[in-house]
UniProtKB/Swiss-Prot annotation:
Keywords: Cytoplasm, Protein biosynthesis
Taxonomic superkingdom: Bacteria
GO BP annotations, alphabetical order: cytoplasmic translational termination
Pfam families per record: RRF (PF01765)
GO cellular-component term (any): cytosol
Function of the molecule: Responsible for the release of ribosomes from messenger RNA at the termination of protein biosynthesis. May increase the efficiency of translation by recycling ribosomes from one round of translation to another.
Nucleotide-binding among keywords: no
UniProt-annotated location(s): Cytoplasm
Organism: Aromatoleum aromaticum (strain DSM 19018 / LMG 30748 / EbN1) (Azoarcus sp. (strain EbN1))
UniProt-recorded name of the protein: Ribosome-recycling factor
Protein family per UniProt: Belongs to the RRF family.
GO MF terms held by the record: ribosomal large subunit binding
Top-level taxonomy: Bacteria, Pseudomonadati, Pseudomonadota, Betaproteobacteria, Rhodocyclales
Main location: cytoplasm
NCBIfam families listed in its UniProt record: frr
Length: 185
């Protein structure tokens, strides 16, 4: 019972970190990267699909993303979807490719984005702690039902605490990297 509990708790904690990584990838820094447009959806024959399913998204240079749409009629829809996204980007249609220049971030915007990053990180830490609490509750219930001994309970709680500490440290590292990336000019 205890090994399965540890394994499922570890998997759930890893999923929380994966969600944080995905959320942090959406936060725009001054540099261009293709993952920035991953969550932008465009209407394609009546259904909403990610831009990557109707075009090639590439880097032209460090501050410009290129979007090469496969079907000409979709150019304006893709351009509008990028413009209407919450990223604050202004795409330019150049016939066969849509250029998406990355505007420089102001100091105020950088601070706002840093707050957003910290908030996302705190939410991930809360999720990790909640998973620890749930695992510890399962252990307490097992002790009460006399399925495991109190010594096993204590050892398992220590292991889960180590797992929690390791994941919290990884979250802190991810946040520090993203904040440093945001504050670079």
């Amino acid at each position: 019972m205890i090994p399965e509990l540890k394994k499922t708790t570890e998997q759930k904690m890893q999923k929380s970190i994966d969600v944080l990584k995905a959320d942090l990838a959406k936060v725009r820094t001054g540099r261009a990267h293709t993952g920035l447009l991953d969550h932008v959806m465009v209407e394609y024959y009546g259904s909403m699909v990610p831009i990557s399913q109707v075009s090639n998204v590439t880097l032209i240079d460090a501050r410009t993303i290129g979007v090469q749409v496969w079907e000409k009629p979709m150019m304006q829809k893709v351009e509008r979807a990028i413009r209407d996204s919450d990223l604050g980007l202004n795409p330019a249609n150049q016939g066969d490719i849509i250029r998406v220049p990355m505007p420089a971030l102001t100091e105020e915007r950088r601070r706002d984005l840093t707050k957003v990053v910290r908030h996302e990180g705190e939410a991930a830490k809360v999720a990790i702690r909640n998973l620890r609490r749930d695992a510890n509750q399962h252990l307490k219930d097992a002790v009460k039902d006399k399925t495991i001994s109190e010594d096993d309970d204590r050892r398992a709680q220590e292991d889960i605490q180590k797992l929690t500490d390791r994941n919290i440290a990884e979250i802190d590292k991810l946040l520090a990297q993203k904040e440093q990336e945001l504050m670079q000019l």
